Amino acid sequence: AERCVMELRGHRVGVDHIQRSGKRMGILYLETGSNMRPSKVFYDREYSSIAMIEPDSINWYEILKDAIWFNWTGITPALSQNAADECLKAIQVANELGVTVSCDINYRGNLWNYGKDASEVMPALVEGCDLIMGNEEDCEKVFGIKPKNFDADNTKGSINQSTFESVCQQMMARFPRCKKMAVTLRGAINANHNTWCGILYDGKQLYQS
């Protein structure tokens, strides 16, 4: 843990508010693919610090008092009820202080193991977001919002723009605070070769890199 803190400090990232708790740090393993076998990611988060966070152990007002932007990921509330509760508190404090809030839905079904589904927890969190990042699969599995006439070519890494725009419009209608939606689109050519692009919708126009 100390080595990770030192690495962050070396990049001039503030580490004053880092807390050490739980039994260990969460780990992500990447199994690199070969030829046409895709790469796989394995999340090892059980008993990690954030999964075992204690209620009210973080002073969000102190942490966010000088912040201009707060970003959270859907992986955090997936780990435990306490993690979900603290995530909600952080969002609420950020809203109160006028801090821009963004989220990456980042739905990982195998992480939701404490008795609640993402569809039960995520809506209350996303309600406080100004920018939402998520693809059409995230929106359908978590919020039940289905794209219209979906047509994506993963080989070329392209997407039917009107399809993604329809998802954005439905998300913004459900979560009025959200003013922008973004998604990254990866196209798999083979295990070691991918295309990558970003798409942003601002409520009026769709932009693609």
Q: PLM features: what roles do these ranges have?
A:
Residues L97, L111-K204:
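Conserved phosphate/ATP/ADP-binding segment of small-molecule kinases
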